[in-house]
């Protein structure tokens, strides 16, 4: 295929990038690619320890999609082998290790969600156990000899743990080396990653050169802040917008993003043309409420379609802006297995209002749970559904369910 002009590719690829090392090499690789009609091999490694993707993950996925759209080879490497080690990047302590079966299962889930952003027909998926599992101990020694302990301790997270007297296991030193080995195996021309992966990506450049390969270009993308506006987006911090979440939740959570992050979200997680960004920035500063509503709608459309965006927008206006209860409430009827009295934590989970009992407990403690608009304060509350239903159970501002009494009355 005919590749677009280099300047055109660079304009798109620079968008949102925190750092390109080195940028002139990327332009040269693109130029050579165009002259020889040979696509670049662009690598993105994914950590399968947490398979639920959120908008923060899409920052780097969207960059890989841009390379795809230009005609380059996109290789998504699932770290099923390195996942058994656990990525120590940004960690203050050793991560728990997973089994190969767990990393494979998570990796498949990651791929299925990632192809909501990537073109599945143009995405090559590889598992690094293909080559790392076959290494002999002598190969591991040879790989480890490529890096010194002093060099490893230049990593901020390792150095901080070392200075604080926190343990660093030897297997953690092998993680960046194994990740770098992935680049050697597929002969990557470009590797993408978050800014927290800078050390690992640059290490791969050195390892490629030691193996008589052309060094990859490293493109670092920023870590997107979550809905709290301070910490990076993370499901564990309860500030994430999942790409598989219900449209209403996705819309509502986007509307809770601080005003000063509207433009950053537009730039990093939407496909609004680059030339329109200055106008978007001006609009976000002058009318943040309207700009955020447009952003929320666009994000929902990207993952769920226009009709879902219409419903999510209407749901938000009715429940949050007007403070009402939506007309089309989902309903839940307890089953005999729930028992005569149902624990509220279980009821919220079974009605798909929370993902876990711990989340439900936290929401009650925050005063975010009501029954027929009456706030609930007791995390251990049990409900006689046959006597008290029907009622509207609300969790947070956007999650509702109408609880119906069991069909067989009090015989639950």
Swiss-Prot record:
A motif ('HIGH' region) lies at residues 48-57. It is found in: Cytoplasm. One of its GO terms (molecular function) is ATP binding. It catalyses: tRNA(Tyr) + L-tyrosine + ATP = L-tyrosyl-tRNA(Tyr) + AMP + diphosphate + H(+). It is an enzyme of class 6 (ligase). A motif ('KMSKS' region) lies at residues 232-236. The keyword Oxidoreductase does not apply. Residues 342-405 form the S4 RNA-binding domain. Its EC number is 6.1.1.1. Its main location: cytoplasm. InterPro entries: aa-tRNA-synth_Ic, Rossmann-like_a/b/a_fold, S4_RNA-bd_sf, Tyr-tRNA-ligase, Tyr-tRNA-ligase_bac-type, Tyr-tRNA-ligase_bac_2. It comes from the Bacteria. Keywords: Aminoacyl-tRNA synthetase, ATP-binding, Cytoplasm, Ligase, Nucleotide-binding, Protein biosynthesis, RNA-binding. Homodimer. HAMAP family: Tyr_tRNA_synth_type2 (MF_02007). Belongs to the class-I aminoacyl-tRNA synthetase family. TyrS type 2 subfamily. PANTHER family: TYROSINE--TRNA LIGASE (PTHR11766:SF1), TYROSYL-TRNA SYNTHETASE (PTHR11766). Catalyzes the attachment of tyrosine to tRNA(Tyr) in a two-step reaction: tyrosine is first activated by ATP to form Tyr-AMP and then transferred to the acceptor end of tRNA(Tyr). This is Tyrosine--tRNA ligase.
């Amino acid at each position: 295929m005919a590749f677009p002009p280099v300047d055109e590719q660079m304009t798109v690829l620079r968008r949102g990038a925190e750092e390109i090392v080195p940028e002139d090499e990327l332009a040269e690789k693109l130029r050579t690619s165009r002259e020889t009609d040979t696509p670049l091999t662009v690598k993105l490694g994914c950590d399968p320890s947490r398979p639920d993707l959120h908008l923060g993950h899409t920052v780097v996925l969207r960059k890989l999609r841009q390379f795809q759209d230009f005609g380059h080879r996109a290789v998504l490497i699932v770290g099923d082998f390195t996942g058994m080690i656990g990525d120590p990047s940004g960690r203050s302590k050793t991560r728990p290790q997973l089994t190969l079966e767990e990393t494979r299962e998570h990796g498949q889930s990651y791929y299925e969600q990632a192809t909501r952003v990537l073109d599945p027909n143009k995405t090559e998926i590889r598992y690094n156990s293909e080559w790392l599992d076959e290494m002999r101990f002598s190969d591991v020694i040879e790989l480890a000899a490529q890096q010194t302990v002093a060099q490893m301790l230049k990593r901020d997270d390792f150095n901080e743990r070392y200075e604080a007297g926190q343990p660093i296991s030897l297997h953690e030193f092998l993680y960046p080396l194994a990740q770098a080995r992935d680049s050697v195996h597929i002969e990557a021309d470009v590797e993408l990653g978050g800014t927290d992966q800078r050390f690992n990506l640059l290490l791969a450049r050195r390892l490629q050169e030691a193996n008589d390969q052309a060094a990859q270009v490293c493109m670092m993308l920023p870590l997107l802040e979550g809905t709290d506006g301070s910490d990076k987006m993370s499901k564990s911090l309860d500030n994430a917008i999942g790409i598989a979440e219900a449209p209403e939740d996705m819309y509502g959570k986007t509307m809770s993003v601080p005003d000063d992050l509207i433009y950053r979200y537009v730039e990093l997680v939407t496909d609004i043309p680059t030339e329109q960004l200055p106008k978007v920035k001006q609009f976000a500063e002058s009318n943040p409420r309207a700009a955020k509503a447009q952003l929320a709608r666009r994000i929902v459309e990207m993952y769920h379609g226009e009709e879902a965006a219409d419903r999510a927008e209407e749901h938000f206006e009715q429940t949050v802006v007007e403070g009402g209860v939506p007309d089309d409430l989902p309903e839940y009827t307890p089953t005999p297995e729930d028992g005569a009295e149902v624990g509220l934590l279980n009821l919220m989970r079974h009605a798909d209002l929370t993902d876990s009992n711990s989340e439900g407990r936290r929401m009650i403690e925050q005063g975010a749970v009501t029954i027929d608009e009456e706030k609930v304060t007791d995390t251990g509350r049990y409900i006689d559904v046959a006597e008290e239903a029907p009622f509207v159970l609300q969790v947070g501002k956007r999650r509702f369910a109408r609880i119906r009494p069991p069909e067989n009355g009090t015989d639950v």
